[in-house]
Amino acid sequence: GTFFSDTSALIGNEVATFPYYPAEIRPPHNTIAGVSGFQVNTGANVKTSGDLCDILVCMNPASLAANINNAKIGATLVVDNSLFEEKIYEKAKFKSNPLTDGSLSNYNLIAANFSEIVKESCKDLGLDVKSVDRTRNLFGLGIVLYLCDYDLMVTLKLLEKKFKSKPQILEANKAVLKTGFFYAEALELQISKIHVSSAEIEKGKYRN
């Protein structure tokens, strides 16, 4: 969320964000009570963090269950399907797998196994399993950048700035971000890209 909002700002958009955190301090694993998120509204004349979303990124069944009602009909859902096993999606109150039972037919669904894809992207970088798994968000971000028709290079430069002292982590994040972007491109989606209008910003000095 932070990289997306920073990218939006750098290409000339107004940005409003709203991070939210689990409803419980130590909620049961893979339950709705444990869901956190980061909402971004970007474009011209942005006044609030937004209402219903055009793109929803979900990393697990609980995230989908908690947020699906916040997505517009016809919105694009970007979902990591690696945890959509029966025992896990039932914890999120789904009676069947929502990715395959037709219940999401009113949305544009992009479902992929983020975990396996990032492992492949990082296989030659010598990173431990936990570090590789942490790059999953960057795969989702790459897809979102493509859907919003954003310049990939802007986000890559942000990564270089943040992780310049950690070259292995930097290379992993860059590789996974590119993989997500080109994954979406290769799908040849019958989905219109979202055009985000740039804000008219007065001349002056600004700090991010």
Question: How should these model regions be labeled?
Answer:
Residues 1-208:
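Active-site cofactor/cluster-binding pocket
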